[in-house]
Amino acid sequence: MVKAVADTNSHAENAAGFVSDDSKVTGFSHLHDSGTGGNPSLGNFPLWIHPGCPGDDFTKCSFPASSRGVGRVNGSARATPGYFSIELENSVRAEMTTTERAALYRFSFPDGGIGGSKRWSITPDGKRVAVPFSPLILLDVVDLGNSRTGGGTQVYADEGSSAARMVGDGKFLPSFGTGNYRAYVCADVRGAKIRRYGTFQGPDSAEEPKFIDSIYSGGSAGSWVQFDPPTAGGAIVARVGVSFMSVDQACANAEAEIPTFDFDGTFRAAQDSWREKLSVVEVDATGVGEDMQTTFWSGLYRSLISPQNYTGENPLWDSSEPYYDSFYCIWDSFRAQHPLLTIIDPIAQTEMVRALLDIYRNVGKLPDCRMSFSKGFSQGGSNADVVIVDAYVKKLRKDIDWATAYEAVVSDAEDEPQSWGVEGRGNLESYHRLGYIPVDDVDKNGTGPSSRQISRLVEYAYEDFCISLLAKALGHSEDAEKYHKRGGNWKNIWREEQADIMREVHAGELTLSPFTGFMQPKRLDGSWKYHNVRLCSPKTAFHSCYLDTRHSTYEGSSWLYSFFVPQDMAELIQHMGGPQTFVKRLEYWHEEVAYMGNEQAFLPVFQFHYGGRPDLSSYWAHRYIPSQFNASINGIPGNDDSSMGAFAAMVFMGFFPVAGQDVYLITPPFFREVRIQATGPEAKRAGRKAIIRVRNFDPTYEKKYIESATLNGQAYTKNWITHDFFREGGLLELTVSQRPVGTWGTGKDDLPPSYPVGERDDITDPSLIPRTEVPAKGGQSLPHQEH
């Protein structure tokens, strides 16, 4: 729950607090969400510390976040799992480490060459001045989004003692949803003799009162304590507990988890916890560059950051079930992160599914997005359905109430909520009757954005398909047939003759590529409405398809969403003109239209597998790593709410999931060998591992095409594997070559499964299609061996 870091006043997206630019640090707070986009999230109750005040007058120190910011010393930031530190221009070095519900801060004061009883301070206008060394630490009852409405604060101390306690509470707004939440804080500070203490509101500070029971809305307010100078080499230490239940619970959390104020010991314990969490994966990185290793481990680490375990901290209802928050959003995470967790942390993934079902029991709907105990804005379909089915098909069934799970996903499919902009699905009456979402639909049953008719439709169809899998498994045969049929609804908005054109006022229609056939919106009467197939891509009006717009796709183009038919890729390929045209079309998308900063782009990297060209999936995986995912400051192409990290981690390990299905698409790992602890009970007790080994491994990655494979010593020609490999363990050996040779993964029986609606006899075997060419470095091409 606690993730301590320095907060900045960056004008860039600072939803997670810290931004690596030249912005000023304004505080050190304890609650954060990562990679959310939108408004800043959490960042409640930041601490701030001055090394001293001008003229030794505490009223001349800057208290508000708007004026107290100080620049960081370039290159001083250090981050590792469980630890963050930074040096500021005001003679402060801040270090922080965490436990589950508390943070421990250590503030030291290098003299910066001034020496003696002085330290440097920075004035609000940026001037560096010498001040008497007498640290003043404050607790600000504010958040990153400056959303507080009401609240209170109190400080407890005895003059002449060396310990004080500051507490506070406030009501805040979520960053990407509706409603509000209350949070509570308890900060114990010590390290030197206390000189004075009091409270502040805005720029005004005083020693009295010690208690404010009603802070006006917005702006900085809180408590403060000023110390004598710590002894040589000494520090001011702050232990901060947080809670969503009460101040008493916040104090109890801190006292239970950090009883001794031992910073180094707390840091070691945090490191040990992270080592244990990451130890389920081992790699042989011989020859692999340090930056590539950093990119992999950083991605794996980030995949474990959210959702956050708030069990025991839910003020909304009493329950013995786990409670997880910060699902930011499942529209992002269902594609990569949750499937990865089924492999590396199935206990947490099981708890998350249970938490989703408990939300359904108490709120009435599964969330698509949820943060700070509030309903978040839905971005597409009811994607928790996919997460739940994914858990079932991968046998994460223990302790999950599958009767309630089925009830919940059927509720999404059948029952429209009053406000489907924050849960469930919308336009269901028309969707059920027509099999699509009309652009001119008048929804009398609920309210939500009148947009995203293409992107919502393809997601609704896939979610219905996933529900059909669960229905069949649980014995609901009629439901299974109904939802399987709805899984084919994507065909209702497939416009075969739609060209890749742009309509210009003066130039008329411009044909941009030779490809035809795209998802297009329809009206109630069945007529088509033109939608620029490149709208919301890097080529056209990139940022025009967000929640507050009326376009038919969300954060992506029709070019992109026209590939999203993972339930029946075989038929989609036929609609696109057969395997050869499909492959050319997918290559064109990667070359000309793709943007990897949104999660819908993940699966198309590997969809060449369905066209019998797993070599091209490998090629593009090696293009995006390291061009888009790397160890540089810009080494993540989009906001990472754990999904970007999960994508990178799985690409490095040599597989990618088709979420909601028991399918992982195989590409060569970026390591000689990857070893993952098997998750099945017997396999885990026996210490078995799922091992992916590369024969002819080349750390320059010139050899990146799978020539042949064996699974547990037997020839293996499929280009995909099932979850049993990770559950029971085994050895998958991949022989790689510099050029795509042989027929591995190209035959009709080697392709990932498709689940047609009705019978089809016209599916072309991709193995009968001659390979053309694959791009190589420098824009050249490598010839493929025909077979």
Regions found by a protein language model. Name each.
Residues 1-338, 342-350, 354-386, 392-443, ...:
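Accessory carbohydrate-recognition regions in carbohydrate-active enzymes
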Residues 463:
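ATP-dependent phospho-/nucleotidyl transfer catalytic cores
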Residues 497-521:
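Selective recognition of specific alpha-helical transmembrane segments in multi-pass small-molecule
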